[in-house]
Amino acid sequence: MTENPGTTGNAGQNAQLALLAAKNERLADALRAAREQIVELRTQIDELAKPPGTYATFLAAHDDGTVDISSAGRKMHVGASPALDVDRLQPGQEVKLNEAMTVVEAGGFERLGELVTVKEVLDGDRVLVVGRADEERVVRLAGSVRDLPLRVGDSLTVDVRSGFVFEVVPKSEVEELVLEEVPDIRYEDIGGLGKQIEAIRDAVELPFAHPDLFREHGLRPPKGVLLYGPPGCGKTLIAKAVAASLAGMVDPHGTEGATSYFLNVKGPELLNKYVGETERHIRLIFARAREKASQGMPVVVFFDEMESLFRTRGTGLSSDVETTIVPQLLAEIDGVERLDNVIVIGASNREDMIDPAILRPGRLDVKIKIERPDAEGAQEIFGKYLTPDLPIHADDLAVHGGDLAATVASMIRSVVERMYAEDEENQFLEVTYASGDKEILYFKDFNSGAMIQNVVDRAKKTAIKDFLATGQRGIRVDHLLTACVDEFKENEDLPNTTNPDDWARISGKKGERIVFIRSIVQKKGEQGSPRTIEQVTSTGQYL
């Protein structure tokens, strides 16, 4: 059987046509790719050949579609692209210009700049700021900060060339030095200080609660209160309770959402090695207090460890920085500018070192001594920390028929009797006065609310350790008695008896001058003889 020559020829032609078609398709693809690459290269060449664009700061827009900008420190009036929504631009916003100096694109706000401090808020869009070397300038507020509540002392970033403020930096020197809060301490949380609390409430709360009566009697509220006494007896707690109580009195006077402010000034951190910085910080603190008080809110400015800042001038006990710090505080308290709704509370255990000009009437009018707690006050303080909701040991509960409240009350009485017993076990120091008289001081003479809290905490820790060792849960009276003894022993070496007179001032044992102190607590121990520490008559200069 033979093949048809015509059929064979057609098949060869078809194969050749298919091959040519494939070549044409590959060639078309190559040409298309080359064309696209040429277009892309041309685009890149065009981009590279473009003149440089310029960035400027938007100032204002006009009805005819033109805008005012600031470019490189020059104010210019230029056109804007029709595709750009000019009405949405904000003052201080960054914009992009083409080679014809036409605004073609909107950007954001500058995030960098020089750091300045607000000295005065002039109006809705301008502030007076202080920069380097105390240079003052008036700058405009950009749209990013125009609606923010600015206050004196705030740190801002500013572009000096355009004169715009772009950002409020969360770094205020005042906020570093004060704690602006409303404490949650109530008068009911403080034990053993009923008389002192009543005195400070009369001095602070009455003028705020009944201002009409004070005006009727021509009586001005006190400007300040000094709380003084030994350490750990509740001075700071009382100041916090005053602020919390004033906060609770605001709402009944019809100020919705209002509160009081407690500015807890960290005294030693105010001190600065640069001349005038401490005084500036004090001015900023009182400016913040006046700002809050101008809204009708009571403000408590609390200076803890007041003697660290406001020592008696001219004593030579320090570098004499107080010669300018003390007058600054005096000017703030009773200067030309009135200080309304602001109460200054100072706390100190060395009130003898505070400048007398601060303590005179008209400045710190009310002076309240916070005494060490007596036996009755100690029971009240124990009741704040040793409460019936704590786990009590079953053996102690069984003695009182399972009555939880009676058991806790009995435990408190037992530990207070042990703490305030005037027996040989509780003897602490023997002091000799300048007249030659001697007196035995007991541990009760150095008790404080802080020490009572520590005794209860020790007992709780011992109860936890006993539970882990024996499986018996709860606090026992033995835990409290042991904690009391351990607290006494731990405080044996703590009093600084090198200078008896200074020690007496800190410990609250004022009166006749003490010339000699002898520790007798070690008589109860097994090692050594009683420790005797004599007064150092001349300390000289120590390196």
Swiss-Prot record:
Keywords: ATP-binding, Chaperone, Coiled coil, Nucleotide-binding, Proteasome
One Gene Ontology biological process: proteasomal protein catabolic process
Residues of the signal peptide: none
Gene Ontology, cellular component aspect: proteasome complex
Chain coiled-coil ranges: 13-50
Matching Pfam families: AAA (PF00004), Prot_ATP_ID_OB_C (PF16450), Prot_ATP_ID_OB_N (PF17758)
Keyword Nucleotide-binding annotated: yes
Domain of life (superkingdom): Bacteria
Pathway the protein takes part in: Protein degradation; proteasomal Pup-dependent pathway
InterPro entries: AAA+_ATPase, AAA_ATPase_domain, ATPase_AAA_core, ATPase_AAA_CS, NA-bd_OB-fold, P-loop_NTPase, Prot_ATP_ID_OB_2nd, Prot_ATP_ID_OB_N
Residues binding ATP, per UniProt: 232-237
Transmembrane segments: none
GO molecular function: ATP binding; ATP hydrolysis activity
Keyword ATP-binding: yes
Region (Docks into pockets in the proteasome alpha-ring): 542-543
Subunit record text: Homohexamer. Assembles into a hexameric ring structure that caps the 20S proteasome core. Strongly interacts with the prokaryotic ubiquitin-like protein Pup through a hydrophobic interface; the interacting region of ARC lies in its N-terminal coiled-coil domain. There is one Pup binding site per ARC hexamer ring. Upon ATP-binding, the C-terminus of ARC interacts with the alpha-rings of the proteasome core, possibly by binding to the intersubunit pockets.
HAMAP family from the UniProt entry: ARC_ATPase
Function: ATPase which is responsible for recognizing, binding, unfolding and translocation of pupylated proteins into the bacterial 20S proteasome core particle. May be essential for opening the gate of the 20S proteasome via an interaction with its C-terminus, thereby allowing substrate entry and access to the site of proteolysis. Thus, the C-termini of the proteasomal ATPase may function like a 'key in a lock' to induce gate opening and therefore regulate proteolysis.
Record comment regarding domains: Consists of three main regions, an N-terminal coiled-coil domain that binds to protein Pup and functions as a docking station, an interdomain involved in ARC hexamerization, and a C-terminal ATPase domain of the AAA type.
Recorded family membership: Belongs to the AAA ATPase family.
NCBIfam families associated with the record: pup_AAA (TIGR03689)
Annotated protein name in UniProt: Proteasome-associated ATPase
